[in-house]
Amino acid sequence: SFLSASKERRDLLLCQREPTIDESQKLCGDYGSFNTLVARAKQARDIFLVIGPPGTGKTSFGLLNILKEELTNPTANVVLLSYTNRAVDEICSKLVESNIDFLRIGSELNCDKAFSDHLLCNRAKDCRNARAVSELIANTRVFCATTSALNANIHLLKIKHFDLAIIDESSQILEPHLIGLLAAHTSTTQNSQLKIQNSIGRFVLIGDHKQLPAVVQQTAEESRVDEP
């Protein structure tokens, strides 16, 4: 996927060219203190980084407001990704609170029961045929998944174009887990010329490159708390 991607996308992912910015892009919504962040994310035509320590609202406000602004375009489609199922559950909870319809890629084993109705595999059971499934996918504007789940269902990127990917907790994700997704594309031939379209137009990476995972060095005996 990466090797056959367009030179422009390969150069971007390999840091061989600078990302482009379109300052003519203006906000359609009002996001209070997050207006500057959302505006800069919208103006970024390739990639945008959101960096901040834990508890600064990167997911609760940053991700959600960037998503809401993107959805002001009635034809825009967005995929929301993270490394762990727990992080995707958190994203799903924010979408439910905001009454944003979405589909989740994955299985019931890895999904909080509160969001099982949003699983594509469950929603597809109500579809009578393959055409109905295709219509469900085409008519849904927001998708959620772990990077592993989307990599396992990479064919989704062959049948649906996403204008934006927002990747939460991206500092936890190794490059090989992402590069195939960000380089995914479809190829068509027009007038004897090969035309390549990126499956994901722009992407926003959210995370904290200084954040370390929790490490427990105590034994279970030392960590045990007994009732007085």
Regions found by a protein language model. Name each.
Residues 96-149:
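Inter-Walker segment of RecA-like/P-loop motor cores
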Residues 54-56, 61-62, 66-96, 103-106:
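Conserved RecA-like ASCE P-loop NTPase motor core of nucleic-acid helicases/translocases
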Residues 73-76, 83-84, 98, 134, ...:
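Conserved helicase motor core of SF1/SF2 NTP-dependent helicases
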Residues 1-39, 93-97, 105, 110-122, ...:
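Pre-ATPase regulatory/linker segments immediately N-terminal to the P-loop/RecA-like helicase/translocase core
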Residues 37, 50, 57-66, 87-91, ...:
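Extended, hydrophobic alpha-helical segments in both membrane/secreted and soluble proteins
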Residues 88-90, 111-116, 212-216:
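Switch/connector loops and helix/strand junctions flanking conserved nucleotide-binding motifs
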Residues 25-49, 53, 61, 145:
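N-terminal pre-P-loop "Q-motif" helix
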